[in-house]
């Protein structure tokens, strides 16, 4: 009789662990997806709301660039429109999120993010990630509370 009770308890505990793993896997995907969405949105907003230098103009449209150290000001909108994210799950169940520009040739987003020999950096992605830190913690706390039940 005692062995049957122990066996039932062990089986119940195994089911509980399997359920926790499923909830944790789902929570990991939810966290990465939610954070990537927010970083993408924040990067685009930074470009829209950045301070420009009224004393400098470029091009035929009279584009005013952003101040060095600020997110890049929108000129054509190509970079802003190219910012996207993706979330991948590998064969082991690990979830990885990517946020960035899909423009690769030339790597315009990287030139602005890190600067060039002739232009100081206009960080947009790293600034977006930094601005999202408290959001990331809030999402993590919310998900943890839900799955820890």
Predicted regions and their residues:
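Short, Lys/Arg-rich flexible segments
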Residues: 1-149
């Amino acid at each position: 009789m005692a062995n049957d009770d122990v066996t039932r308890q062990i089986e119940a505990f195994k089911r509980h662990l399997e359920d926790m793993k499923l909830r944790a896997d789902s929570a990991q995907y939810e966290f990465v997806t939610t954070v990537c969405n927010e970083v993408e949105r924040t990067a685009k907003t930074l470009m829209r709301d950045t301070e420009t230098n009224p004393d400098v103009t470029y091009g035929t449209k009279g584009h005013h660039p952003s101040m060095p150290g600020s997110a890049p000001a929108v000129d054509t909108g190509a970079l802003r429109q190219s910012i996207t994210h993706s979330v991948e799950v590998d064969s082991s169940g690990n979830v990885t999120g990517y946020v960035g520009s899909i423009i690769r040739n030339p790597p315009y987003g990287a030139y602005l993010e890190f600067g060039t020999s002739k232009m100081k950096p206009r960080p947009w992605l790293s600034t977006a990630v930094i601005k999202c830190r408290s959001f990331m913690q809030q999402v993590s706390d919310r998900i943890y509370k839900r799955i820890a039940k």
